[in-house]
Amino acid sequence: MGSCINEEKLAKFFQRSLNALPAPYTSGLPNHLSLIFFVVSGLDLLNKTDILEKEKQDIINWVYSRQILPSKDNPEINLENCGFRGYNFLGQEFCCDKSVHTSENGPLEYDLPSTPNTYCALLILRILGDDFSGVNKKAIIDSLRKRQRESDGAISGSPNVGDYDLRHLFSACAISFILDDWSAINKESAIDYIKSCLSYEFAFGQTPQQEAHGGPTYCAIASLSLLGRLDVLEPFKEQLTFWLVKKQITGFCGRTNKDPDTCYAFWIGASLMMIDRYDLIDFASINAFIGSAQHEAIGGVAKEPGQLPDVMHSYLSLVGLSFGNIPSIQQVIPCLNLSKRAAGKDWFEKLI
């Protein structure tokens, strides 16, 4: 089966988005690395990375400029604040060709890394063929070590910030897998936290006692997959499967009694892929729904038909289509959200 989207138009949409974004994206600049990841990985899935050949080294340099390192004079200073930030903020010197070392006085107050930005930075570098020689792996792992809460195993997104939830636990697991160092995470405590987020619907909320939602459910299952502990799902796997399959209307929705949204082709689709139940859904309907949400003139995919497209929905829709084994789209490793081509044999074999 072929895709219902115009792949050439989508590739041009990603290419334009790399160079300029409309004003509404301004509020997303704290997560700028995720926007670049959507574009770069989207072109990778479409087999169009040749488009990036001229800009490739500039993108790699830009990603490294987002890295926050320990003090150059004393590597033990500021270990809790290392990783990748999304973008430059007030008071931080703009520098587009080298990573930033913090001063002896510590980091600027609002210049913080986050686990999602670090995860996206590492994936961008992998897709573009970087060898990670500029990544301070020790500093990232040492910083990550300070993020896990002892009381329940939850992990925060940034140093001294109280947003503990499954998004950041997943990002931490992905970072640990990518850097091949799990020493920062108490695995059993992390698994206990995942279990605590299970709702009465037998899917997962973002934090304990929250409504089951497609995004956190993906984060929970992907974390367990990276941890090698999908067996945790066995006692309620059939109920979880039922909840996931029932999210399909034409496309998937993310919560019970909500309208379909193209991004859940990834969140729900990848969850079903990881538990080996994707054969239970109607892929032709998913394909058609995504095709109907592609903007004829702009080329990107919106959250639903008739809306304006954006890079997130365009990318996650494309990943959702990859689960249908469409020949023109690269296959994706669901638990990493990365093409098998970019992952390479070394990462892929560790996940089998």
Curated annotation (Swiss-Prot):
PFTB repeats: 135-180, 187-228, 236-276, 283-325
GO biological process assignments: protein geranylgeranylation
Family matches, as InterPro entries: GGTase_I_beta, PGGT1B-like, Prenyltrans, Terpenoid_cyclase/PrenylTrfase
Gene3D superfamilies linked to this entry: 1.50.10.20
Catalysed reactions listed for this entry: geranylgeranyl diphosphate + L-cysteinyl-[protein] = S-geranylgeranyl-L-cysteinyl-[protein] + diphosphate
Positions of Zn(2+) binding: 261, 263, 313
Molecular function in Gene Ontology: CAAX-protein geranylgeranyltransferase activity; protein geranylgeranyltransferase activity; zinc ion binding
Necessary cofactors: Zn(2+); Mg(2+)
EC number: 2.5.1.59
Keywords from the UniProt entry: Magnesium, Metal-binding, Prenyltransferase, Repeat, Transferase, Zinc
Family: Belongs to the protein prenyltransferase subunit beta family.
Function: Catalyzes the transfer of a geranyl-geranyl moiety from geranyl-geranyl pyrophosphate to a cysteine at the fourth position from the C-terminus of proteins having the C-terminal sequence Cys-aliphatic-aliphatic-X.
The protein's name: Geranylgeranyl transferase type-1 subunit beta
Annotated source species: Dictyostelium discoideum (Social amoeba)
Gene that encodes the chain: pggt1b
